[in-house]
């Protein structure tokens, strides 16, 4: 068999293989889409919610109703970081004190979108000890906590070094960027906008 003929036959075989592969991939995608369109974990909690009040009092739900879960999560007591004397007084719409105007923007955006959050809730990282991420947010539907670190002084070399080290420790402790933790950054030449923050919240929650 000549090299030219071998090349043509090989190209045809490769084409046929890729067409079959593409067809199977498309079938898998359709199956996933069908599953996602029918998947509704809320139905599991709805079974309890639909019970009459008298019957609810007799039942111990296997899955805690979402309203109770969120309320319990939001009311968790904790000790955050203290504020230094002379630090600027900046308060969120929810009435809590934060350290910067950018943190206020993030907090107010979370509040406006109905995302439960804690400010500077203590988290333990192996190899670093206790840290206080700016926000721990609750993805209500997934019942999943997502951290949010806002690094607002990246133009400062000492701050930047410390921030990058902290980010490295998050990774080593299993926090996946964009899945378990959100990072936003600012410097003297760049400030984050409310539109960007809103986009992050909509895409994540």
Show the residue positions of the predicted features.
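Nuclease-adjacent, charged terminal/linker segments that flank catalytic cores
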Residues: 1-73
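Active-site metal-binding core of divalent-cation-utilizing nuclease and nuclease-like domains
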Residues: 96-98, 111, 116-141
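Solvent-exposed, charged helical/coil patches
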Residues: 50-115
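Short, charged/polar micro-motifs that form catalytic or ligand-binding hotspots
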Residues: 15, 93-100, 156-160, 186-187
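Acidic, metal-coordinating catalytic cores used for nucleic-acid/nucleotide bond scission
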Residues: 124-127, 154-158, 187-191
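Basic, glycine-rich
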Residues: 172-205
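Short beta-strand-loop-alpha-helix junction that forms the active-site gateway
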Residues: 90, 132-166
């Amino acid at each position: 068999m000549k090299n030219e003929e071998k090349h043509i036959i090989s190209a045809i075989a490769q084409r046929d293989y890729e067409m079959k592969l593409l067809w199977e991939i498309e079938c898998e995608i359709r199956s996933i889409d069908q599953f996602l369109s029918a998947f509704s974990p809320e139905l599991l909690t709805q079974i309890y919610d639909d019970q009459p009040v008298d019957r609810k009092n007799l039942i111990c739900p296997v899955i805690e109703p979402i309203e109770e879960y969120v309320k319990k999560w939001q009311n968790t007591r904790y000790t955050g970081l203290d504020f230094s004397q002379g630090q600027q007084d900046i308060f969120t719409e929810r009435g809590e004190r934060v350290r910067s105007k950018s943190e206020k923007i993030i907090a107010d955006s979370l509040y406006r979108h109905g995302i439960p959050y804690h400010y500077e809730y203590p988290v333990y990282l192996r190899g670093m000890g206790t840290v206080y991420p700016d926000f721990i947010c609750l993805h209500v539907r997934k019942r999943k906590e997502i951290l949010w670190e806002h690094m607002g002084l990246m133009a400062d070399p000492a701050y930047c070094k410390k921030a990058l080290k902290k980010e490295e420790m998050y990774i080593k402790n299993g926090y996946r960027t964009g899945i378990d933790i959100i990072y936003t950054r600012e410097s003297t030449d760049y400030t984050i906008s409310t539109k960007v923050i809103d986009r992050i919240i909509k895409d994540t929650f």
